[in-house]
Amino acid sequence: MRKLVVGSRRSKLALTQSQQFIDKLKAVEPNLEIEIKEIVTKGDRIVDKQLSKVGGKGLFVKEIQHELFEKNIDMAIHSLKDVPSVIPEGLTLGCIPDRELPFDAYISKTHTPLSQLPEGSIIGTSSLRRGAQILSKYPNLEIKWIRGNIDTRLEKLQTEDYDAIILAAAGLRRMGWSDDIVTSYLDRDTLLPAIGQGALGIECRSDDEELLTLLSKVHNDEVAKCVTAERTFLAEMDGSCQVPIAGYATISDQKEIEFTGLIMTPDGKERFEYTMNGTDPVELGKTVSNKLKEQGAYEIIKRLNEQH
């Protein structure tokens, strides 16, 4: 096998999860020589604006995909939730490895449970999806925008006027944070995860047969089916960063895929949700999308997209 060059964002989390995946590859092919090339994306450069307001689709992947096309790198290790639902022609997701915990972590300054926060308490999040679902269940709380890496957000929780923050559990775990800092992990009924949350997507050139053969050794087929249902739903709903959209699939004991899709308004007042089981992940994602469109969810998407 030739020496491989992996493209990664420069953030501490991106580099850490890239190294963790490289370690997984080396466990099956110990003699691999792999180098990480750090790439700064548009999303990394925007630190003072809410990403949903600057056209969030692909903000963290486009520059990396360009490096793949130019053959400056052989593969890219993405957080799958950052990857648009349509992959450019000539590239492919060569592997979906094991999924980290897909839920969100709620961290309170005073370790107060979410359901017991006083009226007017301020929750920090950078996600319309999280904000909408919290306001839907707890309309007496206030959502305040927060950006920055994990360390920055934890510091802002202590030094600024946030009573709690919500972060992806996967990032905390990959960075080695102890469960002790988490007040609670929010289950799917409280906060349905983002499409692909907790999963990695390993992107490479479609014609790189040698690399695709290697990647197949660390591919998790069950996780791939789940995220395919989720990403099909995202593509069918034409969900942009202006739309609070969530979707989560699991494999049942009967080996069926159970998928829940959710569309909301940012204020949490309108909510469209549907759950069903199936065996074909693409058909399942499409069917749940159609069910939500029948309920009127697509009108929300059109309205929100027109506002931006």
UniProtKB/Swiss-Prot annotation:
Keywords: Porphyrin biosynthesis, Transferase. It comes from the Bacteria. The keyword Transferase applies. InterPro entries: HemC, Porphobilin_deaminase_cofac_BS, Porphobilin_deaminase_N, Porphobilinogen_deaminase_C, Porphobilinogen_deaminase_C_sf. GO terms for molecular function: hydroxymethylbilane synthase activity. Disulfide bonds: none annotated. SUPFAM superfamilies: Periplasmic binding protein-like II, Porphobilinogen deaminase (hydroxymethylbilane synthase), C-terminal domain. One of its GO terms (cellular component) is cytoplasm. It catalyses: 4 porphobilinogen + H2O = hydroxymethylbilane + 4 NH4(+). Its EC number is 2.5.1.61. Binds 1 dipyrromethane group covalently. Transmembrane segments: none annotated. GO terms for biological process: protoporphyrinogen IX biosynthetic process. Its cofactor is dipyrromethane. The modification S-(dipyrrolylmethanemethyl)cysteine is found at C241. Pathway: Porphyrin-containing compound metabolism; protoporphyrin-IX biosynthesis; coproporphyrinogen-III from 5-aminolevulinate: step 2/4. Tetrapolymerization of the monopyrrole PBG into the hydroxymethylbilane pre-uroporphyrinogen in several discrete steps. Monomer. HAMAP family: Porphobil_deam (MF_00260). Belongs to the HMBS family. The porphobilinogen subunits are added to the dipyrromethane group. This is Porphobilinogen deaminase.
